[in-house]
């Protein structure tokens, strides 16, 4: 509070506190007239009291302007501290400030003020010296001259009278030069403030000098222009420039405007600093996952030194050193065990995302670069989350069906393209990956790598050197298995080697190149031990996704998925997409399913379910994170405890025969589980479980397992803390107290509290540093305490580094057992998949299939597996009887919406389920080993390739004719409908004849061309049979109604009843009536033609009975049936 003149006697010096003066103390009112000044000076003390009531008139030496602080002590304002900013403090403005502070405290004469709100403007004109000369008081005159002189210099300093623009200019030019970010307050100044240069504060271009932090960011950004950088600055992570704009858009955070470009573009020369956005440190991975999921490449730039170690080092005055420590994309994000998936999509019925594979592709022999060339393709697909590697090398035709099949099977989230692709392949890749609505469920990131003419030789050398160095580092260069391993890699096809070399280089950038050391998990895609399901088959039969909204619900995988673990679900997905061809392996698998569902094994099966139910984490991903060295301490504890729990569950099992199951698959899988128990217990004995659960790095290891570095720094910390305790007696002696007790306030330790009495404060030495205080006490640090705390902080930082180093060594030791741990997890995944299939088999109406070496499909009362689960009503079952030696093909006719497509899909799905090793929805099933299922269903064009619907239809058919074998199942739906009736019938008849006579595949041919039914007569032994979907008719004319029975019957449906579908589609009634009349007229015309043809044949037979052979009579019967 401001004291009145009657209370203006100065207090004792001991109770006075100096308080900083604000900038407002330099403001003055407008200069008064000479007469008024003279009168005011004569008034003396009254004017002093009036001036004291106006805070903006307070001066540095005004004795009357006293205030009370929170302690109740009387304080006096201290003179303002002013930076020199390049001005000589002895000769310039700094000296005047010093002199002004030493002016005697005397009453000030009042100055005139405006009658409006701008009471405290600077005077626009200089002081009137004449008015000062008229005063009779020499002391007042001297004081006023000093004040006016100070006022002139201050106004000049501000840049002009009545102007505050200079203050703003100084703030914008000085702040960036001294600190990295004054606004954020995240970090102390990394370099001392730079004095302002004389003259203009900014360059001619505009904008200020770059801060050390901005220089670091620009230097890193120039090396990674395609990466969004997240930079650690103190206690936040920050984005700069264009990265800040993208982050603000994707993360919904605030972007502070500024420069967007990193190239000093003239259009941004007027801006002083970069645009920026920030996120808290503990939310880093949450936001990184969101950016990576959006398709961006994200880099994390971290500080490589801590504040304590930096303060003790030689570079204490330099900016913090920073480095790009992590790079992330969709496929390489392994820092979170949940990955980018979150909840299991298949289980929730949500969208089916990409599988996490990164696929590298390259081409050769792409001559012509048109749409019809043949190319040789090599691919390598890597799944960093699990360590799986798939490779393949193949030729492909102009439709690129082989490439499409592999892309749909693997479903990559990232593509690495080596060299240029042909136009057809490029268009296919863009079609499959260029939209969020594609078959992968999300947009796919695409990176491109240049391909030299000598790429094959260079790639071979690079791969050889890579594996040779790894084997040498592992000291296994002379081992026979290691040599065989190296030879296996070097024997890969040329184009696969090119892709492998590119992927090694690509993943090295992300620190994940170690995955290629796990060559045990290299798999060839085109292994002939599995049924081939090409791209069209995956889509048409809805193996992984439905065709409505591309989600997993309603797919075959969704139907069979009853797994309890993530790694079990991934293995089941592989089983679904790659059914077995090996009859022995298949029988072993289905026998295991049968044993799990049998009542005699209920107890053992429940024991397995309980064991799998205890697994709450994704062990497969956990293990690969341990292998990469990215596992956290609580995660490691969870993994080891989970492995210990499941290993102890079957600790009594020594051999497969001890498992309680007769199935070899079940016995071997269970016997492999307890084999890891010894290693797991050994690693757990090194860990302090309580500390690991709380992520306490300092106490993570048990005392007996701590390294020398950890023990040394812990002793150092204990020694410093002991010295701090000993220092209490020294502090007590200085204060003349019996004893001193340390206190902690706001997280600051080792504070000494002293009462705010005059006697107590006198005893506090000047070297003690006041840290905080209240009205009653003040808290101090002694110089010795400050020095000891600095030593303790250095020991703590070094201890943290030693703990991290020891933890990394433990992870490397565990990683040396990766193979055995991975085999155990793979056994658990197998058990999970078999239990899932057993749950399916336990449903009513499912039967164990019988396998035969003969190519056949004999199913009694079969049902569609997905439709049956989705529909509330019961599904109408149907039989199927196909045999390579008897009826190889069925010609399926029937009304629209009569169930033709569902029937043929049902047959294909039952065959696939049987070769997965699952029970099938039927009364009985006997199936041969099919090597492939091909489908040509649906109608769509390919505008990107300039292909019409009919062109796409025939191209896909041509691919089927090239790949199909006598052991394949082929489904052709309404071939030939994309052109005129005559051409369509001709093409359909030719294709059907070729399939039955030449390829001899099992064929299901759906058509609305009744004329094709005559072909059945031309094949002996009923190789081609006519079947139709049954229905009943009622009414006639416009009241005609049709009822679908969804049952398969022998013979041909001579009408398609398209008008019935038109009625269901709610076409206008007048339109339907016109269509019905036209249809009746056309049918009558065709019937008359057939009747005329029949009469002509009968007449010819009467004239020449010799024509009456078997084929002639069959034709007569067929024509009569069509009437």
Curated annotation (Swiss-Prot):
The keyword Nucleus applies. Its main location: nucleus. InterPro entries: DNA_mismatch_repair_MutS-lik_N (IPR007695), DNA_mismatch_repair_MutS/MSH (IPR017261), DNA_mismatch_repair_MutS_C (IPR000432), DNA_mismatch_repair_MutS_core (IPR007696), DNA_mismatch_repair_MutS_N (IPR016151), DNA_mismatch_repair_MutS_sf (IPR036187), DNA_mmatch_repair_MutS_con_dom (IPR007860), MutS (IPR045076). It is found in: Nucleus. It comes from the Eukaryota. GO terms for molecular function: ATP binding; ATP-dependent DNA damage sensor activity; double-stranded DNA binding; mismatched DNA binding. Component of the post-replicative DNA mismatch repair system (MMR). Heterodimerizes with msh2 to form MutS beta, which binds to DNA mismatches thereby initiating DNA repair. Msh3 provides substrate-binding and substrate specificity to the complex. When bound, the MutS beta heterodimer bends the DNA helix and shields approximately 20 base pairs. Acts mainly to repair insertion-deletion loops (IDLs) from 2 to 13 nucleotides in size, but can also repair base-base and single insertion-deletion mismatches that occur during replication. Heterodimer consisting of msh2-msh3 (MutS beta). Forms a ternary complex with MutL alpha (mlh1-pms1). This is DNA mismatch repair protein msh3. It comes from Aspergillus fumigatus (strain ATCC MYA-4609 / CBS 101355 / FGSC A1100 / Af293).
């Amino acid at each position: 509070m401001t004291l009145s003149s009657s209370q203006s006697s100065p207090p004792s010096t001991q109770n006075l506190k100096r308080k900083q003066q604000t900038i407002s103390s330099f403001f003055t009112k407008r200069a008064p007239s000479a007469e008024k000044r003279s009168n005011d000076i004569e008034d003396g003390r009254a004017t002093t009291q009036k001036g004291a009531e106006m805070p903006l008139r307070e001066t540095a030496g005004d004795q009357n302007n006293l205030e009370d602080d929170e302690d109740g002590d009387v304080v006096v304002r201290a003179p303002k501290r002013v930076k020199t900013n390049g001005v000589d403090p002895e000769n310039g403005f700094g000296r005047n400030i010093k002199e002004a502070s030493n002016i005697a405290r005397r009453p000030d004469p009042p100055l005139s003020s405006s009658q409006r709100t701008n009471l405290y403007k600077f005077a626009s004109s200089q002081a009137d010296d004449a008015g000062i000369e008229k005063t009779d008081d020499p002391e007042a005159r001297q004081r006023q001259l000093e004040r006016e002189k100070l006022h002139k210099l201050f106004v000049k300093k501000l840049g002009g009278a009545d102007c505050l623009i200079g203050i703003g200019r100084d703030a914008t030019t000085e702040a960036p030069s001294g600190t990295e970010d004054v606004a954020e307050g995240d970090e102390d100044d990394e370099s001392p403030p730079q004095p302002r240069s004389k003259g203009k504060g900014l360059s001619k271009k505009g904008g200020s000098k770059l801060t050390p932090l901005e220089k670091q960011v620009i230097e890193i950004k120039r090396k990674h222009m395609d990466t969004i950088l997240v930079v650690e600055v103190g206690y936040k992570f920050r984005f700069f420039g264009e990265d800040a704009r993208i982050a603000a858009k994707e993360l919904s955070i605030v972007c502070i405007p500024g420069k967007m470009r990193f190239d000093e573009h003239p259009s941004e020369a007027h801006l002083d600093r970069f645009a920026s956005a920030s996120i808290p440190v503990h939310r880093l991975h949450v936001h990184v996952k969101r950016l990576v999921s959006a398709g961006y490449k994200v880099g994390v730039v971290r500080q490589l030194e801590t504040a304590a170690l930096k303060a003790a080092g030689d570079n204490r005055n330099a900016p913090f050193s920073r480095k790009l420590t992590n790079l992330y994309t969709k496929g390489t994000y392994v820092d979170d065990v949940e990955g980018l998936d979150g909840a299991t999509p298949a289980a929730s019925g949500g969208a089916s995302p990409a599988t996490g594979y990164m696929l590298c592709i390259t081409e050769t022999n792409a001559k012509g670069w048109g749409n019809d060339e043949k190319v040789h393709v090599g691919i390598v697909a890597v799944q960093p989350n699990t360590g799986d590697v798939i490779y393949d090398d193949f030729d492909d035709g102009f439709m690129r069906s082989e490439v499409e099949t592999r892309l749909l099977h693997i479903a990559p989230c990232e593509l690495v393209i080596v060299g240029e692709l042909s136009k057809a392949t490029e268009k296919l890749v863009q079609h499959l990956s260029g939209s969020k609505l594609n078959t992968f469920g999300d947009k796919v990131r695409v990176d491109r790598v240049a391909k030299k003419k000598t790429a094959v030789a260079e790639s071979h050398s690079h791969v050889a050197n890579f594996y040779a160095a790894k084997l040498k580092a592992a000291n296994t260069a002379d081992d026979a298995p290691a040599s065989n391993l190296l030879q296996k890699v070097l024997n890969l096809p040329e184009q696969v080697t090119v892709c492998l070399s590119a992927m090694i280089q690509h993943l090295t950038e992300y620190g994940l190149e170690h995955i290629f050391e796990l060559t045990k998990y290299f798999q060839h895609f085109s292994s002939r031990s599995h049924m081939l399901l090409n791209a069209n088959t995956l889509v048409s039969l809805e193996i992984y996704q439905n065709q409505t909204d591309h989600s997993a619900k309603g797919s075959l995988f969704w139907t069979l998925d009853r797994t309890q673990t993530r790694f079990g679900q991934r293995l089941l997905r592989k089983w679904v997409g790659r059914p077995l061809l090996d009859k022995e392996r298949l029988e072993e698998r289905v026998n295991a399913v049968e044993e799990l569902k049998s009542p005699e094994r209920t107890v053992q099966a429940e024991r397995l379910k309980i064991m799998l139910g205890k697994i709450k984490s994704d062990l497969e991903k956990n293990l690969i994170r341990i292998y990469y060295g990215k596992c956290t301490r609580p995660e490691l504890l969870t993994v080891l405890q989970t492995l210990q729990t499941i290993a102890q569950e079957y600790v009594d099992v020594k051999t497969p025969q001890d498992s309680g199951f007769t199935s070899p698959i079940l016995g071997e899988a269970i016997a492999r589980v307890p084999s890891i128990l010894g290693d797991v217990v050994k690693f757990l004995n090194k860990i302090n479980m309580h500390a690991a659960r709380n992520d306490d790095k300092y106490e993570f290891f048990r005392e007996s397992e701590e390294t020398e570095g950890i023990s040394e720094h812990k002793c150092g910390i204990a020694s410093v803390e002991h010295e701090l305790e000993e220092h209490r007696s020294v502090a007590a002696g200085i204060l003349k107290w019996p004893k001193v007790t340390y206190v902690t306030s706001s997280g600051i330790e080792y504070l000494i509290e002293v009462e705010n009495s005059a006697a107590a404060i006198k005893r506090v030495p000047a070297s003690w540093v006041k840290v905080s205080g209240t009205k009653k006490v003040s808290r101090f640090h002694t110089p010795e305490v400050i020095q000891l705390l600095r030593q303790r902080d250095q020991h703590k930082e070094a201890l943290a580094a030693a703990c991290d180093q020891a933890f990394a060594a433990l992870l490397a030791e565990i990683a040396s057992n990766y193979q055995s741990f991975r085999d155990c997890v793979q056994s658990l995944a197998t058990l999970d998949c078999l239990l899932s299939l057993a749950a399916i088999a336990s449903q009513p109406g499912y039967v164990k299939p019988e396998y035969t070496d003969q190519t056949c499909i004999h199913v009694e009362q079969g049902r569609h597996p997905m439709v049956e689960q989705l529909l509330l009503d019961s599904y109408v079952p149907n039989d199927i009887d196909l045999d390579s030696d008897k009826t190889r093909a069925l010609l399926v006719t029937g009304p629209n919406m009569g169930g033709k497509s569902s029937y043929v899909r049902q047959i294909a799905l039952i065959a696939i389920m049987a070769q997965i090793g699952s029970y099938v929805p039927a009364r009985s099933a006997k199936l041969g080993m099919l090597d492939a299922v091909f489908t040509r269903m649906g109608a769509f064009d390919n505008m990107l390739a300039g292909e019409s619907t009919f062109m796409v239809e025939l191209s896909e058919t041509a691919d089927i004719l090239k790949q199909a074998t006598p052991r394949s199942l082929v489904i052709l739906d309404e071939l030939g409908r994309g052109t005129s009736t005559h051409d369509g019938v001709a093409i359909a008849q030719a294709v059907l004849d070729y399939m039955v006579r030449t390829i001899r595949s099992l064929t299901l041919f759906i058509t609305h061309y009744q004329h094709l039914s005559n072909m059945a007569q031309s094949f002996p032994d009923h190789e081609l049979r006519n079947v139709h979907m049954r229905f009943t008719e009622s009414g006639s004319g416009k009241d005609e109604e049709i009822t679908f029975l969804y049952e398969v019957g022998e013979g041909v449906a001579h009408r398609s009843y398209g008008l019935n579908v038109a009625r269901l589609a709610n076409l206008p009634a007048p339109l339907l009536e016109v269509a019905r009349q036209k249809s009746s007229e056309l049918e009558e015309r065709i019937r008359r033609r057939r009747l005329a043809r029949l009469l002509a044949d009968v007449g010819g037979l009467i004239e020449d009975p010799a024509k009456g052979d078997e084929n002639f009579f069959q034709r007569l019967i067929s024509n009569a049936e069509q009437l």
